[in-house]
Amino acid sequence: MQISSLSPPEIVAVLPAAGNGSRMQNDRPKQYLTIGNDATGHKTILEHTIDALLRHSRVQRVVVVISPDDTFFHTLAIANDPRICAVTGGKLRADSVLAGLAVVADSAWALVHDAARPCLHQDDLTRLLAIVEQSDVGGILAAPVRDTMKRSTDGFIDRTVERNDLWHALTPQLFPAALLKQCLQRALQDGVAVTDEASALEYCGYRPQIISGRSDNIKVTRPEDLALAEFYLTRLQ
């Protein structure tokens, strides 16, 4: 559906960063681990992620959703940037995103991005943001599945899954703030597991658009991801 507007809507990024990243086996949440080199800058993963968002002229603000017991965010230089604010999140990702949306105008579009996904390419972001001019539902970055996919229930292969129509959901995911808020609230109220923002819209009957994104837009989840993220960051410079 084509939508028209006298002026482009505000784009506000929401970063759920309240998780503890236990799989990293570190003394701090993964988003506060430092990566980079002289070319990219020695910064936390969160800082690299925020830099990638604010580098784009269409992204006006970033809302970082942190844990109630977070002791790291306010020690970072970015905490003093007037374009960035921090709010307290909840136990579930959906709770944290809703906390971020509470400070986003309903007329804005919410660009939800994983705090530990620092290798976002500007071309991908530009193509995703173009959805604002074409849709009233929104969409996500995703990468086509290239590996052979197996289904297993007990450690043994049950069958091979057809991969032609399978996509790896990435972030950012972009939706009208009011619509995303409504869908997240309904999904939570109904006890539906929300693994990403698009799944909340799907539950409410919407079909977000898929924008093919780069596979190097990785999420840092395990210790071995750190070196790969540093490599990809260097290539983005």
UniProtKB/Swiss-Prot annotation:
Site, as annotated: Positions MEP for the nucleophilic attack: 163, 219
Classification via CDD domains: CDP-ME_synthetase
Pfam families in the cross-refs: IspD (PF01128)
Source organism, top-level taxon: Bacteria
Keywords of this entry: Isoprene biosynthesis, Nucleotidyltransferase, Transferase
Gene3D superfamilies given in the database record: Spore Coat Polysaccharide Biosynthesis Protein SpsA, Chain A (3.90.550.10)
GO molecular function: 2-C-methyl-D-erythritol 4-phosphate cytidylyltransferase activity
Gene Ontology biological-process annotations: isopentenyl diphosphate biosynthetic process, methylerythritol 4-phosphate pathway
Metabolic or biological pathway, per its Swiss-Prot or TrEMBL entry: Isoprenoid biosynthesis; isopentenyl diphosphate biosynthesis via DXP pathway; isopentenyl diphosphate from 1-deoxy-D-xylulose 5-phosphate: step 2/6
Keyword presence, 4Fe-4S: no
Site (Transition state stabilizer): 23, 30
Catalytic activities: 2-C-methyl-D-erythritol 4-phosphate + CTP + H(+) = 4-CDP-2-C-methyl-D-erythritol + diphosphate
E.C. no: 2.7.7.60
HAMAP family: IspD (MF_00108)
Family membership noted in the UniProt record: Belongs to the IspD/TarI cytidylyltransferase family. IspD subfamily.
Role summary: Catalyzes the formation of 4-diphosphocytidyl-2-C-methyl-D-erythritol from CTP and 2-C-methyl-D-erythritol 4-phosphate (MEP).
Subunit structure: Homodimer.
Protein name: 2-C-methyl-D-erythritol 4-phosphate cytidylyltransferase
Annotated organism of origin: Pectobacterium atrosepticum (strain SCRI 1043 / ATCC BAA-672) (Erwinia carotovora subsp. atroseptica)
